[in-house]
Amino acid sequence: MKTALSKGQFVVTAEFYPPKEANGSEIKERALVLKDVVEAVVVRDNPLAQVHTSPIATATLLLNVGLAPIVQISIRDKNRLAIQSDILGAVTLGVKAFFCLEDCHQRVGDNPGAKGVFDLDCVQLISIMKKIEHSLVGTRINPFAHPLELHLVNLSKKINAGVDFIQTMPVFDLERFKEFISLIKGENLYLLAGVRPIKSWQALQSMSQMVIPENIVQRIKNSPENKQAEEGIKICVEIIKALKQIKGVNGIHIFAHDWEEAVPILVRQANLK
């Protein structure tokens, strides 16, 4: 992925949630769906504050099938000793890319009584990750957050700490996204715009915290139930094609951890491969 970005290629990455049980076969099967259509996947660390298989164990299996992992290290669950040990272990196993984000609080997960550690913040963690020679380090930002100025201040700190690329939360409102792009113009980092295919009207209703224009809402709502997934793919492809034309966008990150079979469809229909 680092080579692709440096060459100016339009990069495609995707989310990868490790399974909630010990199931190496599932990891390999899902990896094969994504292997030839994305440059890398972000392997999440107990996403949504729920117990999942270790991201480092998952990343090892992904490497074995030829899929490049970007390993998230959670600041919520480990102190700085454990974090540095995990990073060294991951590098020893062949991991070259890492990801840092402020994840869900443990109270919203499946172990609400768990103790949050938060020994480091994301800026400090990025600094540690960048000590690894030839590492690639990413983080995430919400272009539609309010007030955005505070998030941009935090992003500036991460850039100063050495972050190489940012992924955004899913983009549906292209005009507001362009405003965000204008605010970070000139920053020395790569940007992957987030996209998310809408699988159904029910799925759309669970996305209430995202900024989704009314015309997109109506397109899904007015589609027959058996055609909603198809319409969701069509909308996502339209957004991808528009994003590719925006200066400063170096690629896309596909949020489809619960619908991974949609990823190769999106990539093919958007003419990305």
Feature-to-residue mapping (PLM):
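Short, well-ordered coil/turn segments that N-cap beta-strands
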Residues: 7-11, 37-40, 65-69, 94-96, ...
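Catalytic beta/alpha-barrel core
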Residues: 40-51, 73-74, 98-101, 140, ...
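Short, acidic/polar
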Residues: 20-34, 55, 80-87, 147-156, ...
